[in-house]
Amino acid sequence: MADDYYQTLGVDRSASAEDVKKAYRKLARKYHPDVNPGNKAAEEKFKQVSAAFEVLSDTRKRKLYDEFGPDAEKIGFDEKKAEAYRAYKASAGSAGAGGIPYGAEGFDLGDLFGDLFGGRGGGAAGGAPGGFDIGEMFGRRGRNAGPERGEDLTVRVQLTLAEAVSGTERPLAFNRPGRCSTCSGRGTSGPVSTCNVCNGTGRARRSGSLFGGAGACPNCHGTGKAAPPCPQCGGAGVKEELARLTVKIPAGVHTGSKVRLSGQGAAGTRGGPPGDLYIETEVAEHPLVRREGDDLHLDLPVTVSEALLGADVRVPTFQGEVTVKVLPHSQSGRRMRLKGRGVPSLKGGAQGDLYLHLQVKVPEETTAEARAAAEALARAYQGDVRRELTL
């Protein structure tokens, strides 16, 4: 089973959103790649922490995770279908009955795909005990219907802020419904003939059905035609496969940005075209740099003498080091703007800026020399510096 996200962040399952955020920030600062350059273990831990925060910081994702566990994050997961399927499994008296939150017996997505694609349960005809048709419940058309386009898929990718600013290439490996090689996606393994259950009418009475009366024939799904199902895919025309590809992430993405890869989604059924693949980015917080839109903000420490007398200071940026001039008599909190040193615009506009916020740092140890300098400096002030401090 996948790592427990609550354990990864070190919080209770009842933790508030603020507690989750505090735990994430603490761990992100500890394991961030910029703080641990070249440390693969820290990098892997940072990815785990970011993945846990992505789910537990989102109310809807957290609800699904609490109810269905890690299966809710898998490609192709559909909450409504999962709820309906679990209710069906419970009514059929199967193990792992519905209504049990994740953490007890859990929810098995494998059962869902197995029954849909003929792995077990639903079988080639797509039927179920009591005349209940899983295929119709999930909106699946008959295996002899026309070609259907495959579903669009979404894969989430974790990025550092540096990768989001500069752009990157990322190798991906993920599971997706691929075209069955045995039947070339048709779902059948023999000639099409008149359905022997409904005699070509497409309608059949179902004894023991949930609503009674006649409905779409469970054998041909209302088409009136039938053919032997493919033994490999159970008539679905698709089988799960491991896909590998490299995706180029453009500079300027933010959390929630999507990169579309045409034709890289789920395979179409019965020879239909494949869906698209969407790469959704999740940009981790940086321990030092804050992002606001396309602008970046960085606190710049300076010494007392640099603030008083002025100085040329080296500053790291995502585009390389630059030298900035700190003006004499600069106060703590003074803001300096570096034009075009922020985040590129995804819309093709001007690049954002980098804002430096001066932070005057005093010595951490008071030596005799420092004390004498401070006493001499105190005499340079003109009156009480707090004389205008009124409420």
UniProtKB/Swiss-Prot annotation:
Cofactor: Zn(2+)
Keywords on record: Chaperone, Cytoplasm, DNA replication, Metal-binding, Repeat, Stress response, Zinc, Zinc-finger
Gene Ontology terms for molecular function: ATP binding; heat shock protein binding; unfolded protein binding; zinc ion binding
Family matches, as CDD domains: DnaJ, DnaJ_C, DnaJ_zf
CXXCXGXG motif repeats, residue ranges: 180-187, 195-202, 217-224, 230-237
Domain J: 4-69
Chief location category: cytoplasm
Gene Ontology cellular-component annotations: cytoplasm
Tree of life domain: Bacteria
Textual note on the cofactor: Binds 2 Zn(2+) ions per monomer.
The keyword Calcium appears for this protein: no
Binding site for Zn(2+) 1: C180, C183, C230, C233
Residues that bind Zn(2+) 2: C195, C198, C217, C220
Family matches, as Pfam families: DnaJ, DnaJ_C
Keyword Oxidoreductase: no
Gene3D superfamilies on file: DnaJ domain, Heat shock protein DnaJ, cysteine-rich domain, Urease metallochaperone UreE, N-terminal domain
Domain notes: The J domain is necessary and sufficient to stimulate DnaK ATPase activity. Zinc center 1 plays an important role in the autonomous, DnaK-independent chaperone activity of DnaJ. Zinc center 2 is essential for interaction with DnaK and for DnaJ activity.
Family per similarity comment: Belongs to the DnaJ family.
Role, per record: Participates actively in the response to hyperosmotic and heat shock by preventing the aggregation of stress-denatured proteins and by disaggregating proteins, also in an autonomous, DnaK-independent fashion. Unfolded proteins bind initially to DnaJ; upon interaction with the DnaJ-bound protein, DnaK hydrolyzes its bound ATP, resulting in the formation of a stable complex. GrpE releases ADP from DnaK; ATP binding to DnaK triggers the release of the substrate protein, thus completing the reaction cycle.
PANTHER family linked to this entry: DNAJ HOMOLOG 1, MITOCHONDRIAL-RELATED
UniProt-recorded name of the protein: Chaperone protein DnaJ
